[in-house]
Amino acid sequence: INERDTVSQANLQEAAHGLGVGMILDLGVDTFMGNVPDADTQALHAASLIGQGEVSVSPLSMAVLAASAAQGQIVTPVLVKGQDLADAQPAAGVTVTAAESKQLKTMMRAVVTEGSLGDLRQLTPNTAIGKTGTAEYGKETPPKTHSWVIAVHEDMAVALVVEDGDFGSVTGQPIVKAFLQD
C-alpha cells in the first residue's frame, strides 16, 4: 500500500500480465486467468496493490503466476491426459524480466525461510518458494476470508484457495506441503 504513489495501476497491470494474469487460454475447458482492472480512486488503487479491491484471480492464474515467477517467463498451463509434454512452449507476449524474476524468487523464498511458510523447508531439496494470502470478501465486520497459498518446488507449481479458511499459513500450508511431498 505504501507504494501507491510510485507504482501506477498501469505498472501493476503490466506486471500482472507479465506473470500470466489475464492471459487467454485454449485448454478445451473454460478458464479464468484473472483481472487487474483500472482503479478510479486512490483507495482502490492501494487495495489493488495487495490483491484486494476489484482484483480477481483464480487458483489456475495464481499457479501460473508462481510458475512464471520461478521460470522467469510466462508458463503456459496444459491439460495432461497421458500425453508427452516435450513440445510444450512458453506463452508469447510480455513476460517478467530476469531481474524481476530474481526479485520475486528471493522474496518468495524468504516467505519459506523466514516467514509464514516455514514448514515447506522440510521438503527435499530445501528449495521451495511461496506466498500466503488472505482474500477478504463480503460486507461483514470483520470481513470473511478465503486463505491462499501459492508455492513452487522443483518443477511443480501449486495454488490453493480454501474458502472461508483462516490465514494461508494456518489453513493452506499443511495441505500444500502434503501435496508437494507426494
Give residue ranges: language-model regions.
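Short, gly/Ser/Thr-rich active-site loops of penicillin-recognizing serine hydrolases
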Residues: A88-A92, P174-D182
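Short amphipathic alpha-helical face segments that pack within enzyme cores
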Residues: S58-V64, T171-A178
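A short acidic/glycine-rich loop-to-helix N-cap element
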Residues: V162-G172
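Beta-lactam-recognizing serine transpeptidase/beta-lactamase-like catalytic domain environment
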Residues: I1-D164
